[in-house]
């Protein structure tokens, strides 16, 4: 990019995305898939900035580094989640941006690793005085046992994201089910597994914006149809299969809490946000029991920023999509000012 006099001009902002989220044209430009989160965010950025470019993070990082050096962006909007399908590499991407001394939106390497670790994050949160499920880790090669925790248990990959590998069979009710589920997951993922006590109640989602974060109104997952086969927690299918949600009359809605519960949710969410080193935006997932106990399940350092996530009953309810995107950018600018 050059000025009228031929001098190099810095790009205002670069949208950094996963290679799998679009296609590269013959002229070398990367174009996000239509109706994708990446396209929606890019549209917001181009409405606000004169120069907004897209860079796809390639598994061979040299082309990515060269593209970023050439554009020399004032800030990077980081929407990456993996490298070549490996979600544990999101921290490495943030590390590359740090090494290049490029300001960027979102959580850094330390926070990514903390939040992605479904065991370590619970240990950190428990020290804050927030309730967490009792749990243990089964490493590859470990013997399989419940270690005294009562059934039922939930079994999930330690570093999974987006409910990867979580389905109705993740809920195990005896040692036979536990062994079977561990065997299946070991054949599918090469990582430790977390087994945690199942907390009866409802899923509660709390989004945060900014670095002295505004806590958005909590949202709960509601299953309208009852029955033995009704989902009791959020699975990959529940999140991604519209017909399945229709069949079980599943919806998300704002959760109305009394003043004391609201104070508890706000306080816990802010403390978790900072303890897990989240930045600019994030989401905390809880279970809310019928007795009103708030139990931390996991933190999401880069929750969905598609416009549907800003819907009237979803986590960023009340904030228009362009405003949320701009607030994230401005939070990152303030945090990195002087770099």
Regions found by a protein language model. Give the residues of each.
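Short acidic, glycine/proline-rich loop/turn micro-motifs
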Residues: 24-28, 108, 164-167, 309-313
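Flexible, glycine/charged-enriched surface loops at secondary-structure junctions
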Residues: 194-196, 279-283, 339
């Amino acid at each position: 990019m050059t000025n009228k006099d031929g001098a190099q001009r810095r790009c205002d902002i670069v949208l950094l995305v996963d290679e799998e989220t679009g296609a590269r044209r013959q002229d070398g430009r990367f174009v996000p898939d239509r109706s994708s989160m990446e396209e929606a965010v890019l549209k917001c950025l181009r409405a606000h900035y004169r120069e907004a470019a897209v860079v796809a993070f390639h598994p061979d990082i040299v082309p990515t580094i060269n593209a970023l050096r050439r554009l020399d962006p004032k800030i990077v909007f980081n929407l990456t989640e993996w490298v070549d399908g490996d979600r544990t590499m999101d921290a490495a991407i943030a590390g590359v941006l740090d090494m290049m001394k490029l300001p960027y939106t979102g959580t850094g390497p330390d926070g990514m690793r903390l939040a992605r670790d479904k065991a370590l994050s619970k240990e950190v949160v428990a020290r804050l005085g927030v309730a967490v499920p009792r749990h243990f880790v089964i490493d590859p090669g470990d013997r399989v046992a419940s270690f005294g925790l009562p059934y039922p248990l939930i079994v999930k990959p330690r570093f999974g994201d987006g409910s990867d590998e979580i389905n109705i069979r993740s809920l195990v009710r005896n040692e036979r089910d536990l062994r079977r589920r561990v065997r299946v997951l070991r054949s599918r993922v090469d990582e430790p597994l977390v087994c945690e006590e199942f907390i009866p109640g409802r899923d509660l989602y709390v989004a945060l914006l900014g670095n002295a974060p505004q806590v958005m109104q909590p949202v709960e997952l509601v299953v309208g149809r009852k029955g033995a086969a009704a989902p009791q927690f959020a699975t990959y299918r529940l999140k991604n299969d519209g017909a399945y949600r229709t069949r079980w009359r599943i919806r998300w809605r704002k959760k109305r809490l009394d003043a004391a519960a609201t104070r508890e949710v706000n306080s816990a969410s802010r403390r978790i946000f900072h303890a897990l080193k989240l930045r600019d935006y994030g989401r905390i997932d809880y279970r809310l029991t019928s007795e009103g106990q708030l139990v931390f399940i996991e933190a999401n350092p880069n929750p969905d920023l598609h416009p549907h996530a800003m819907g009237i009953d979803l986590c960023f309810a009340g904030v228009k999509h362009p405003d949320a995107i701009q607030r994230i950018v401005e939070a990152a600018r303030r945090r990195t000012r002087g770099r």
